[in-house]
Amino acid sequence: NIAKGNFRFANSLYLDAVLSAVEKMHENTFEEIIAKYVEMNVAHPFMEGNGRSTRIWLDMILKKRLGKVTDWAKIDKVQYLQAMERSTVNDLELRFLIQPNLTDKVNDREVIFKGIEQSYYYEGYEK
């Protein structure tokens, strides 16, 4: 079982059920995709690397469904982490943070690699 601060992620006893529920969630609109992303974050299936892997996972869904990826380099660390903390109650803040930073540069290596670099920065690694 994993916790961060005062937040406990999904109990490991129920991880299979939680992941099955996440898999069944719709992902046809931006709103549905973000809702699915929030639930996957709550599932938190790994001991390390959840944030980084789920951001890549989110971009793969966005690319497949909407032809977009997130330009993570444009999203402030503090604002993003606060939006993620509050997203289980309401994902509106997260949607408003991510949506204007979507790009159609889905095959641009610089956007992808800068996003991975930013992802490490969100997790506490220095740039």
Regions found by a protein language model. Name each.
Residues 1-127:
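FIC/Doc superfamily catalytic core
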